[in-house]
């Protein structure tokens, strides 16, 4: 895949722009950070050249001047919401985030529980857990009339009921495990609390997507819409920016909805607002670091198709209706892409049709397509991995990396001693067996050395993956999708 984004240019421009905004605001600046800070996989997929740690690398230049505050929506704890890219709960991700921030030398000691209600026992238990771990927790309540009733919100009956976070540095980065966590409300509540204490403070937003200086229906912006389809977010032209400057800028519905509150609040607290539009609030320089628009457009279209398959599988797993996948189907239409644009889909389906059993296909980074079929010894995903490694290592397809004699004892262990009904080897078992063989086989060693070259490859399977295969592909950095059907009919599914 062609590089479409200049990482180094971005880091330089972005840190400079944040410092310029700090000088403009004066006093304390609350910087709302949208998206993921140090593992932004979505951005790295739709902007080839953007590395998952891009944003944290940029913030490292300001490390000694900032502290990090993590917000989490109490309702997400009650819903047991998870990060799909890492397959961990938001609850665990808060702890993971703080650990990583601290390891990198950032000050991170505050968590804000937003929209907490007294009957949310899951969130209350998490609050106690955080406090036992030595973290400082502030509680923010559900405010009636938010975000429309500005006068109530900017009062003791609004932000006044929230607990105030005692920050110690003049740049406060507010982040969260995912969207809808209440980052903006946290910033506004803090500004209100600062004003009550005579502290000058302001707000700015660093949201990677949608990219304000790309067209509304640019595939990169549409990919963000697909990624947030469960929130029913939509990209829109910023009407305030258009009115103020007669210039079109891309924003999204929640920013536009809350802007009147932010503007009114800043006027009530400071006498005036520095911003005429939601776009003015932002400090995002991502669009200015795109160096190959065509490469980014193609990467974004592929991401939209992946999101569509993911929605179909999630709906099948959770036995939900097709609301989310239907929204993404509309986005696909706007972006001008279909499932046929994902080359591995047709190849995997061809394998299934010709064998009558589940099939799998991978597109290597140079465009070669490799398939895997289900056999008595191997599942199709495991077979595909072995075939892909042989292709990368230049090993003839007729060569067995693992002999039937080496596989059969593993099958016996699974079925006779470990209680498995499926004798076929999964991807993890195949890779362990290959690692053992590599000690005595130069061919196996060559194949194993190619594992790193699977990262970033696209894979499609004709049935929903089990948790083991799914986890292995995630760890390998493979971009996998599946048809929304199970290999066998059953009511109970082990996750």
UniProtKB/Swiss-Prot annotation:
InterPro entries the UniProt entry points to:
DUF1846 (IPR014999), DUF1846_C (IPR048441), DUF1846_N (IPR048496)
**Lineage: superkingdom:** Bacteria
Task: Family membership, please give it.
Answer: Belongs to the UPF0371 family.
NCBIfam families according to UniProt: PRK13663.1
Supply the HAMAP family for this chain: UPF0371 (MF_01567)
- For this entry, the protein name equals UPF0371 protein Cgl2998/cg3325
